[in-house]
């Protein structure tokens, strides 16, 4: 009898854990749009980079040094808040002073695609700081690499 109760309890805990994991994985995807920010693909980001628009890698320095978009600038977003549209920006760190001083200047943010919230959050902070031409490459470095575009 005790074994049966323990077996049921173990299965229940395992099922609950799996359900919570699945729910958190589903919630981790960034939204497809962001008000006040234009979502773009890798080809458009490449055209903008070729015109001199800053392309900003929001990943940590180690990732930037390992591989990034050729010509991208590293401005790491240090993320501690939840991966959610209602994130607590007070928990995170992002140096807005490293962005162009002209708030009308265009800029592109990217990180590691849909599950990476750093570029999404950086776009929100830039928008809320008054920047007017924010572009978010939601597909991030994986999309860039898949298109065969240059990296360093």
Identify the residue ranges that each predicted region occupies:
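Positively charged, proline/Ser/Thr-rich regional signature most characteristic
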Residues: 46-107
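Second-shell loop/turn segments in exported
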Residues: 30-35, 80-85, 109-114, 131
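Solvent-exposed loop/turn segments at secondary-structure junctions
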Residues: 60-64, 79-82, 113-117, 140-144
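Flexible, polar/low-complexity N-terminal or interdomain linker segments that lie immediately upstream
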Residues: 2-66, 152
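Short, solvent-exposed mixed-charge patches
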Residues: 144, 151-152
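Catalytic cysteine-centered active loop of the rhodanese-like fold, especially the PTP/DSP P-loop
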Residues: 91-138, 142-143
